[in-house]
Amino acid sequence: MVHYSDFTVDSRIQRQARALAERGDRVDCICLSDDAEFDVGTGTIALHRAASGKPRGGARAYLEGNARFLAGAARKVSALDRRERFDLVEIHNMPDVLVFAALRPKLRGVPLVLNFHDTFPELFATLFDRTARHPLVRLIRAEERLSAALADGLVFVTDEARDLLRERGIAGKQTQVVMNTPDERVFGERRPAAEPPRSGELRVVYHGGLADRFGVETLVRAVAQLRAQGEPVALDVYGSDAEAARQLAALAAEVAPSGVRIAPQPTPVEQIPERLAAADLGVVPTMRDDFTELLLPVKLLEYVHLGLPVVASRLPVIERYFGDDVLLAEPGDAASVAAAIEGVRADPVAARARAERASQRLAGIEWRQQRQGYLGLVDGLVAAKRAG
């Protein structure tokens, strides 16, 4: 596997690597994590660092960071392939062009899977305020098509992402939707829905990315509004972006000095259930743009799995999968988020009923089902290679 991320906090990578290793496979992950090797089930996961980290800055620094990781990953893949003789290589975007890191095994006939975590053109346009017609965005669309054409199999996170890429002419010989649902081996079985407290402090939690598009500033302001009205609401925020955490902490000190705690630290996947154990409510305040309209946030699925009521932004994919079984708020509107949180406090019985219905919806897409589809794709490609 090749992925431009830290293995310890990337839940999608971990789930899929563990699914393979548990049944006896060896999985080499070329990533941003320190070199390490450990047994999982009857197999092994080995981590290989290909770059020191992601640079901060504008579009140029972002693309240069991608290029450096691609070069380092290509060297690692080639060296490991000489020794291990890979049966399959899986590339996790972004960027899509990481498929070229697997050029050596691809040339000797090894099947290549491109796993679309996100749609890169939409994300790049959102990050750097570019239009769809900007030359760089058009170039990224071209590399997306070329990268997909090199792959033997394509993996998508939702039906919506698959359908969008099909509209752009991207289709593989074999495709599979593998959703980001929590791994029962890490999170345990789905927990019974919890009823928020009728009195006393309501503990709200957010964990994950702290970039502007995740809307955490809106959530901080919403909690500040509630506290100004005398509502005993507290917010815990967990995120690994130190600079964004510093800015959010400064905002919290200004608008809600005693009610918001910003924890600027990564949350390893296996620690998420413990971190969220004291929470009464999970909030997913994602902003609306072309990129986020395609998202079904992992954190939302984790809150539902753990039995928490959820307040989430009114976004198309969230509405499709959960309807009114999560309380919906308008993206970027602190008053709307505050009203939704207040609604949980006002009627905890209804909040628990919604959480229970959301949990039942999750039952239809949980990881044990996604795992079967993922392993089926991998095994089919490897079998076809060996037969041909």
Mark where each language-model region is.
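Conserved acidic donor-binding segment of nucleotide-sugar-dependent glycosyltransferases
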Residues: V326-A334, G343-P348
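Nucleotide-sugar-dependent
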Residues: D10-S11, F214, P266-R275, G282-V304, ...
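Carbohydrate-associated surface elements
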Residues: S33, E160, T181
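Nucleotide-activated donor-binding/catalytic signature segment of Leloir-type glycosyltransferases, i.e.
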Residues: E201, R246-L276
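Acidic anion/phosphate-binding donor-loop and adjacent secondary structure
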Residues: R166, T181-G200, G215
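Conserved donor-binding/catalytic core segment of Leloir-type glycosyltransferases
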Residues: P196-V223, D236
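A short, well-ordered alpha-helix in the C-terminal region of glycosyltransferases
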Residues: G343, A350-G364
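Membrane-proximal helix-turn-helix segments that form the acceptor-binding/catalytic region
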Residues: R104-L107, F120, H134-L154
